From Swiss-Prot:
An example Gene Ontology CC term for this record: nucleolus
Organism this protein belongs to: Debaryomyces hansenii (strain ATCC 36239 / CBS 767 / BCRC 21394 / JCM 1990 / NBRC 0083 / IGC 2968) (Yeast)
GO biological process: maturation of LSU-rRNA from tricistronic rRNA transcript (SSU-rRNA, 5.8S rRNA, LSU-rRNA)
Residues binding ATP: 66-73
Biased composition (Acidic residues): 339-349
Name this protein carries in UniProt: ATP-dependent RNA helicase DBP9
SUPFAM superfamilies: P-loop containing nucleoside triphosphate hydrolases
Lineage: Eukaryota, Fungi, Dikarya, Ascomycota, Saccharomycotina
Amino acid sequence: MGQDKKNLTAAAAAAYVDDSTTWESFGLDARLLQAIDQLGFENPTLIQSSAIPLAIEEKRDIIAKASTGSGKTAAYSIPIIQNLLQDESTEREIKSIILVPTRELSNQVSQFLEKLLIFCNSKIRLINISSNLSDQVINSLLINKPEIIVSTPAKLIQILEKNVNSNLINLSTVKNLTIDEVDLVLSYGYLEDLQKLESYLPIKKNLQTFLMSATINDDLNDIKSKFCSRPAILKLNDEDSNQNNLVQYYAKTTEFDKFLLTYVIFKLNLIKGKTLVFVNNIDRGYRLKLFLEQFGVRCCILNSELPINSRLNIVEQYNKNVYNLLIATDETNDFTIQEDEKDEGEEIEENKNEENDGKTSKNTKKPNQKKDKEYGVSRGVDFRNVACVLNFDLPTSSKSYIHRVGRTARAGKSGMALSFVLPLNEFGKHKTASLSTAKKDEKVLRRIVRQQSNNGFEIKPYQFDMKQVEGFRYRAEDAFRAVTQSAVREARIKELKNELVNSDKLKRFFEENPQDLASLRHDKELHPTRVQTHLKRVPEYLLPESARADHKKIGFVPFHKNKVHKNRKRKPSGRKPDPLKSFRPK
């Protein structure tokens, strides 16, 4: 099982592993131990060795703070399953609720739980009600009273309110409540849903609670007071282990030069490994994709307009190295702007101006734009082996920046983050390439630098050698002119149609034929209105000297080649001699 076992191994860095503890020391069920061994977990991580005994033996509530890749999911999943296996009750009841902020994360948590339940799935059943299932299918699954429910807060409340007068879903029997990525759950505006959930749960009884997050702040106090009693607070001090793994840069550039530099970076393969590019809106993502496609740079898009099945498949294929370049739309900025201003302590007048700007920007948003409110990629989703995070558009808050760069340098691996920053005096000079949020780039950068400095991290300025890049400018301008607003709109419609077809295939055909899933790709070219095939080839004279191929000098080559045939006998010049005149008698 060698190679498969390595592929299933959780992304826990060596710095997080607790070699002094074994899984057998927790007294886990044999079926659970067998599943853990099949996953390739040799030893528990530090957060697991601290949380699991407290949760199983002492039945304590757990509030855990640890970095991405430290094993937080297993830290709450294993105690939940162990307690359910020890439960001698024979009645089918809903006993555990796991809440996550996004549908993508709910899918990943469900897949991980299914691997842990592989040897005991007849006793413990699991349902992910945030998956793309109809209400009728979900209701039919809930009738069987699954022991574990994974959901987003909004979806769970929706089902509870629809079935308030029926006995379809009863949470009075729940013994465990888990909120994963609790800080993001709050920033997504789920606090009201959590308050509604309080009335459905047996909080005054023996309800065990897990609150897991990479950051812990004052916003957590309200949740802690509602759902926890005498919690054990675990903080894994892993800043030192992460500090040397992530290298952060920012580059000040103009609006159009963002596209120019991105073209040069990916066409010349200046970044080795997989890259995650963040943009601030959906149109921006398609504009960048159409721009890069003209140079033969293949990439795929991830945004809230795509069907959930397609989004999950894109993340899965990206993690399997099917794609090396993913353009993700981060639409969480609106939730964090005001929070970030309060946390960073900006001046009152500056806050007022920014709030007013925020209001006007909200009013100018396009109506009737259907988006999935439970979409999120900048935090929580497990992007594996990301070598670089490129902030093509700088986020509007330092919190969002932390969430983005947290997708790389995970689990002890090295990574790099590069952010493009637009100086204020360059804003609006290139209207087609302009973005409204870029007006505050310098202000946001100051907050980011200050916050990272307080945490012991450094963001270094990076200066591109524009003399080397200048030769590519005319090609970039030619390609950018082809990406018109109508081309972007047509690309969005075409992509949505393709993904709707793909989503239907994923839902039906590929469930029965998983081996054919590899044939479904999401990085197909969308083509702008004007296709210019010559742009896909980079002439050698544009390359820097270090990147040019070494050719032997062959000397001077004349324009006209002498027509000399070496193998043909040389003809005598002039007329042939007359044999009568040349004949001489002896």
